[in-house]
């Protein structure tokens, strides 16, 4: 989990638009963020394995 202060800081409107960055909506992680799903790779994997993300399945071949 990211610090609460960092999560609040990311939500505030920035003075300059280039400073804005994405954070995971679940845990607040800033790295390995997937825009399409709005979450980081770790939360994405957990939710996909539980079947909480429609249309996403684990691949096997």
UniProtKB/Swiss-Prot annotation:
The lineage of its organism: Bacteria, Bacillati, Chloroflexota, Chloroflexia, Chloroflexales. One of its GO terms (cellular component) is cytoplasm. Zn(2+) binds at residues 24, 27, 40, 43. It comes from Roseiflexus castenholzii (strain DSM 13941 / HLO8). This is Small ribosomal subunit protein uS14. The keyword DNA damage does not apply. Binds 16S rRNA, required for the assembly of 30S particles and may also be responsible for determining the conformation of the 16S rRNA at the A site. PROSITE patterns: RIBOSOMAL_S14. SUPFAM superfamilies: Glucocorticoid receptor-like (DNA-binding domain). InterPro entries: Ribosomal_uS14 (IPR001209), Ribosomal_uS14_bact (IPR023053), Ribosomal_uS14_CS (IPR018271), Ribosomal_uS14_sf (IPR043140). Part of the 30S ribosomal subunit. Contacts proteins S3 and S10. Its cofactor is Zn(2+). Keywords: Metal-binding, Ribonucleoprotein, Ribosomal protein, RNA-binding, rRNA-binding, Zinc. GO terms for biological process: translation. Belongs to the universal ribosomal protein uS14 family. Zinc-binding uS14 subfamily. GO terms for molecular function: rRNA binding; structural constituent of ribosome; zinc ion binding. It comes from the Bacteria. Gene3D superfamilies: 30s Ribosomal Protein S14, Chain N. The gene is rpsZ. Binds 1 zinc ion per subunit.
